[in-house]
Amino acid sequence: MTKALQLARALVPELSPSLHKGQAGRLGVVGGSKDYTGAPFFSAMAAMRIGVDLAHIICEPKAGDVIKTYAPDLIVHRVLDQNAPIEEIHQSVDDVVSRLHVLVVGPGLGRDDHMQACAGAAISIAKKRDIGLVIDADGLWFVNNNIDAIKGYKKAILTPNVMEMKRLCEKLSINPDEMKEEDIASKVSELLGGVTVLEKGGVDRITNGSKTLTVDASGSLKRCGGQGDILSGAAGTLLAWGSVYAKGIGSDKDIKVPHEDIPLYAAYGASTFTRECSRLTFEEKGRSMITQDMLKNLIQAGSFIEYATFSNNYYDIDAQGVKIIKDKHQNLQPTFVFLSPPSIDSLARRLVKRGSETEESLRSRLDAAKGEMEYAQTGAFDYVIVNDDIEQAYEKLRKVALGEGTESDILPDNRIA
């Protein structure tokens, strides 16, 4: 796993009985006009499926009537009425935004003057409330015509596609022909005052002007409309979680994300997640794939955020995670390897010698290790490697990873090597 993905995953709040409704993310989507009702639904529902607690859609009244029939899980506010005074709309939007961690502006917004004015009001309110912003689709049309509205707001993520990026470059007087392709997004971010840019393309480039990350994982060959809306919901979710993370709620992970880089890693995680979801859906549906199919694969694609913690230590997948994957992701066909200490006594000696444990944490870790070693003997793992010599254990693990493991190297069927 890349360091960037570890940092993105660190934003994910642990589910805990101590959290109450809304603390795992409250997201809003501004969009949904007379012509477009699917886009805001996909964005908000993607956020719900990925893991936010609450998702609101702020939309035009007729669009709201339709969106309300899609899913009872979404909270729909039909307040962007072209016949209402802009002051009334501003107050209605502010009432909703005041409850949110993040606002996504653009899915299904449209470009008529009224909806563009509503986008401007929403962006202004989000900035005043100091919450995360994701700007996509026709929200970028507004930004392109009102650059100062977003310049310098470092809690924002822009998600331009090829054409939207071209417009931004023209607006900012950037000549792409005079630059390396990989430097264009960084220059856009720099001229926007450090706003995070997620440039969508064959390779997604994510940058805040000083740091640049890339995602080139395979996605879908079918470019059906709506995948960008899934991405905006994913980015909004991780940015909402970043807000929770910055407040120290629901996360005790050792991996620390600099607060100024939260939008960067939120965008990186969203890109990785969406590409994986798109790939899985295309493998299943092929040419007939539509965006609605992706919603069904969001949970499976979300396996990248599986993690476990113990005594405030962070692990990718432990025995608990193996159980989750076996139960919920049977089609992945992974190879499960358990790295075992030679014995509980030897583990205890190692931990005592390390001097990093209190009596209470030592007892807890040994109890947990005993349970996991017993679980390893139930047939749950393809290989059990005893870590009594780090170099030998590494060599055995390397052979497993390369498919070179044999019974003489590593005894399968859960017999300890």
Annotated model-derived regions:
Residues 356-403, 412-417:
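Small-molecule kinase domains that catalyze NTP-dependent phosphoryl transfer to phosphate-bearing small molecules
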Residues 167, 324-326, 344-350, 392-396:
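Switch/connector loops and helix/strand junctions flanking conserved nucleotide-binding motifs
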Residues 323, 331-354:
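Conserved phosphate-donor/acceptor-positioning beta-strand/loop module used by diverse small-molecule
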Residues 292-321:
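ATP-dependent small-molecule kinase phosphotransfer cores
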Residues 271-275, 407-417:
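A short, charged, Gly/Pro-tolerant segment at domain boundaries
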